[in-house]
Amino acid sequence: MNPDVNAISPAEARRRFRDGLVTPTAGWSAGYAQANLIAVPRDYAFDLMLFAQRNPKPCPVLDVLEPGQYAGPLLAGGDIRTDIPAYRIYVDGELVTEVADATEYWTDDLVAFLIGCSFSFEAALLDSGVPVRHIEEDVNVPMYRTDRPCRSAGRIGGPLVVSMRPLPPEQVADAVRITSRYPSVHGTPVHVGDPAGLGIAHLSAPDYGDAVTIRPGEIPVFWACGVTPQAAVMQSRPPLAIGHAPGHMLITDLRDSELVVP
């Protein structure tokens, strides 16, 4: 990880992505919250909002934009269609392409949801000496589809997706304590230990992102992940949906400290 990206402003990060830089965003703009994007047609927006309300761990909503709107208070002067490093375009639930600029696919009917991202609490983990392996190895965080169904809402339903960070056993409690103060970006882990408990067969083969090294004696710790709405879109098959490429987030102007609860 280039240490310079840790210190740049969210606006500068978004400018670089707008100019065509494609990279995972873990470790970027320390101190600022990152967000997942999922945009669906207005006709599906209520179902998606209800899905998020019923599944707050994987889908903590930071903001919802008006139909067709592509700017908002979390990205001053920004453009949601261009300021994320990479986007996934879904048609009838099928992933049809991944692009660095979603402008040509955006319609006046799309409603954009910005969902909290666990990258937002990683600076707090690192500040407390808790390792974050994908940052150490300069790769994307590993993410997995589980066999746990989310609560459905109208036409929207699908499996829970989780991110994984391996930790020494003596630091698991610290990670739980630290992340418990960030409920708006997934909060505490949903599972600790045996991945089979989530229906995950092989940690070395994530469904999204990259595999990371798990050292002898370390325990895999799983957090709910904001890719969950994209898994629901693939199952629910709306005519069009646009999401961030997993691990390639919107870096917002919202400070991590504003998300901390006592």
UniProtKB/Swiss-Prot annotation:
SUPFAM superfamilies: PSTPO5379-like (SSF160920). Keywords: Lyase. Belongs to the D-glutamate cyclase family. Gene3D superfamilies: PSTPO5379-like, PSTPO5379-like domain. Coiled coil: none annotated. This is Putative hydro-lyase Mflv_5194. GO terms for molecular function: lyase activity. The keyword Lyase applies. Its EC number is 4.2.1.-. It is an enzyme of class 4 (lyase). It comes from the Bacteria.
